[in-house]
Amino acid sequence: MNQDRETLVFNKITKTFQFGRQTVTLETGEIARQASGSVVVSVDDTVVMVSVVGGKNVKPGQDFFPLTVDYLERTYAAGKIPGGFFKREGKQSEKEVLTSRLIDRPIRPLFPEGFYHDVQIVATVLSLNPEVDSDIPAMIGASAALAISGLPFAGPIGAARVGYANGEYILNPTKTELQTSQMDLVVAGTSRAVLMVESEAKELPEAVMLGAVVFGHEQMQAAIKAINELADEVNPVMFDWAAPAKDEALIAQIRGIAGEKLAEAFRLRQKQARTVAINEAWDAVKAGLINEETDTLKANEIKGIFKSLEAEIVRGQILAGEARIDGRDTRTVRPISIRNNVLPRTHGSALFTRGETQALVVATLGTKQDEQIIDALAGEYTERFMLHYNFPPYSTGEAGRMGPPKRREIGHGRLAKRALVAVLPPEDEFGYSMRVVSEITESNGSSSMASVCGGCLSLLSAGVPLKAHVAGIAMGLILEGNRFAVLTDILGDEDHLGDMDFKVAGTAAGVTALQMDIKIQGITKEIMQVALEQAKEGRLHILGLMKEAVDGPQELSAHAPRLYVMKINPEKIREVIGKGGETIRSITKDTGCEINIEEDGTITIASVSSEGAEAAKKRIEEITVEVEVGKVYEGTVVKILDNNVGAIVSILPGKDGLVHISQIANERIKNVSDYLKEGQVVKVKAIEMDDRGRIRLSIKALLEEEAKTAQATADAFGLKTQ
């Protein structure tokens, strides 16, 4: 029976646009069609598929927006098979976590207040050109997928990477170009406003950083235009959702119960006392408006109104020119305390306290073997500098679960690392690997910037010759209509209730890291300029205090390893390592040193003990010394050859030579064992070395030389020799 063959037809829509020197293609309608929105982004052989799914119903009792973003790298994208026993991708790498956050941050504030449906964004890297980072395509793809999903999303957004070299900005620099760039900045925003900035730089002026943000925002308009065209052509069915109407009567009730109490609470300068007073105000609201018959949705609505009232009061006080929550004006940095070398056995340590935020930061020096190996999709590499940030629950006076680092901890650690990388000494001047760990012991805002300050101080404590001191500060913003206030060194409450979180780190010469998250649209270039200049003022103040506490690098700790560098002939590396690593293991075990050997013959010996290092150096020198023909050596007979050909004599570690039977004595001998025994110490002369490195030794040659010397002496004195 014949059947007509059916052909599956895809409603495929494609948009292509020029993005600087790169051509970007957006495709939808062929892959992942059951998702709310799905877009495949292609940029010079880098291909990322991004899907968006919006939940149709809200979970009972849901009182927050449950957005999840996962960026996933598949090893097949780079033509690789995963390592390890299971041969499949496992938990997210640090790069995957950081890129997930990069996508999340500019998208989250564009969903409307009160929208509590589940939204999941999954970005999967399908193909990777090592020169084109997949993060910008993933961000553009997420924006495009949301734009065609029908979800209530106030986008689209665009994203761009900006480099800076020879006084010019570079749009979407390649991996190779970034190696010589003075800046690596990622900016995201809508057609009207910037929403997010993430960057590191090599001590660049504030004006250059601001110019990069503006340049990136201008250039990303090409992506926004293409996404809008794609959405128009797709013409998605809009999500059936409307913002809940405000209950003005309920708002008035809550204001009447808690308004004055909250206003008084936010005049209390100490965080814990303020928290108690806010909780008392909330208890009064609960007692008056919530009972056993109140359903969860109504309870959540009441709680939301209470939180909005908190924000309204704090923001109003600041814009009215009143003192901030802790009594400061808008430009003052909280009191700072610095203690260095606080831990006796660590290589370097510092306790940095700014108001109610405190970081105990520890630096550890290691060797080449301690470097972090990164098995990246674009290729394996190592990092000599690591910074890890820990945020335990006790830092905010809470009890909670301890476990592996969360996304926030990884992100904060990365920001602090970006801030310090620019001032690290080059490897050829300071051969150590370095690990900094920031333990946040108290937190009330800006703990990542405390980690920058403490990290710098701990590295100086460890003796690391930094190019300059680095300090960091977090800025905030309150914006209502045409009125705004930029806040220096924000508290945790000011971060939650404000419109911007703007973190700047750098030296006295310029910016080394900048991170900005904006929760509203309408932040102008002028506001960003004011924030940057005010941040510089605060940063210079902190740098002055840091320099007073620790002027420069201190001496290496007695507990830190010392590095000794020597050079050998690269052809001798095999001899130092030995068969199966036997020789090098023996040296490290006997001397207690760590030894690293480079391909060019550079050997680095790391040891806390100078005696151990000298012993290791001597062993290596003995192994690598060249045998000289004509030179006399004292050696040990290690073997009498079975065929009576001669004996093997060890003259240097790893250097054996043959004494042929004819080279043992002047007279003809029948048995080698009549003259030599294993373990016997003899003097030999190196008489020949062939092209394979085999050494021929002679005892006879020395006997002949001794005879000639004796004859010459006798002749000089007129004596007869027998």
UniProtKB/Swiss-Prot annotation:
Q: Which reaction does it catalyse?
A: RNA(n+1) + phosphate = RNA(n) + a ribonucleoside 5'-diphosphate
| PROSITE patterns in the record | KH_TYPE_1, S1
Q: Name one GO cellular component term.
A: cytosol
Q: Which organism is it from?
A: Chromobacterium violaceum (strain ATCC 12472 / DSM 30191 / JCM 1249 / CCUG 213 / NBRC 12614 / NCIMB 9131 / NCTC 9757 / MK)
HAMAP family named among the record's database cross-references: PNPase
Location of the S1 motif domain: 630-700
Q: Which UniProt keywords apply?
A: Cytoplasm, Magnesium, Metal-binding, Nucleotidyltransferase, RNA-binding, Transferase
Domain (KH) ranges: 561-620
Q: Name one Pfam family in it.
A: PNPase
Q: List the NCBIfam families hit by this protein, alphabetically.
A: polynuc_phos, PRK11824.1
Q: What does this protein do?
A: Involved in mRNA degradation. Catalyzes the phosphorolysis of single-stranded polyribonucleotides processively in the 3'- to 5'-direction.
Provide one Gene Ontology biological process annotation: mRNA catabolic process
Q: What is the lineage of its organism?
A: Bacteria, Pseudomonadati, Pseudomonadota, Betaproteobacteria, Neisseriales
Q: What cofactor is this protein dependent on?
A: Mg(2+)
Please give the CDD domains that the UniProt record associates with this protein. KH-I_PNPase (cd02393), RNase_PH_PNPase_1 (cd11363), RNase_PH_PNPase_2 (cd11364), S1_PNPase (cd04472)
Q: What is this protein called?
A: Polyribonucleotide nucleotidyltransferase
Family per UniProt?
Belongs to the polyribonucleotide nucleotidyltransferase family.
Could you tell me where this protein is found in the cell?
A: Cytoplasm
The residues listed in the UniProt record as binding Mg(2+), with positions renumbered to this chain, are: D495, D501
Give the first-level EC class, as a single word: transferase
Q: What is its EC number?
A: 2.7.7.8
The molecular function terms of the Gene Ontology recorded here are: 3'-5'-RNA exonuclease activity; magnesium ion binding; polyribonucleotide nucleotidyltransferase activity; RNA binding
Stored SUPFAM superfamilies: Eukaryotic type KH-domain (KH-domain type I), Nucleic acid-binding proteins, Ribonuclease PH domain 2-like, Ribosomal protein S5 domain 2-like
